[in-house]
Amino acid sequence: MRILLSIILLLSGLFQAEAAYKPHKREFRGAWIQCVNGQFQGMSPTDMQKTLTRQLDILQQYGTNAIIFQVRAECDALYKSDIEPWSKYLTGRQGQAPTPYWDPLQWMVEQCHKRGMEIHAWINPYRAKTKGTTELAANHIARTHRERCFEYDGLYVLNP
């Protein structure tokens, strides 16, 4: 009798677990495209767009449906901002707008949406300067509000 009761309890638990599970309509299959690895430095806007187009095409072929695009690495921006300077990872010099002008984030939004992909902007919220950055733009927070940063071993970090 105990064995029969145990089997009934076990089977009822399995059926309840199966009934509670509802598969998701869609999975998040994302890829991160970063700017800090130097892959864009020295590129013209046209070359950067070609590189990004190739990356998006390959990722789409592999079933990626979301892109996480790094747009703020060191309190600088890969998009038009009234607050943050242009990123050195875009032009090679922080604070310098791309020539010819283009907005990488806006361009990525358009390209991802053409492919039916989501796009998410990735920011580094506290990193203000790495050791590799030697010049800061005049409107960089470490120059305009130095009191909001602390320095450690050549790095600047925003003080939350």
Describe every region a protein language model picked out.
Residues 106-109, 113:
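Anion (oxyanion) recognition and catalysis
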Residues 26-28, 32-34, 38-50, 110, ...:
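Active-site-adjacent "subsite" loops/lids of carbohydrate-active enzymes
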Residues 22-27, 60-61, 113-114:
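Extracellular/periplasmic catalytic domains that process cell-envelope and extracellular macromolecules
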Residues 8-17:
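Hydrophobic h-region of N-terminal signal peptides that target proteins for export
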Residues 69-94:
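Glycine-rich, proline-tolerant flexible connector loops at the mouths of alpha/beta enzymes
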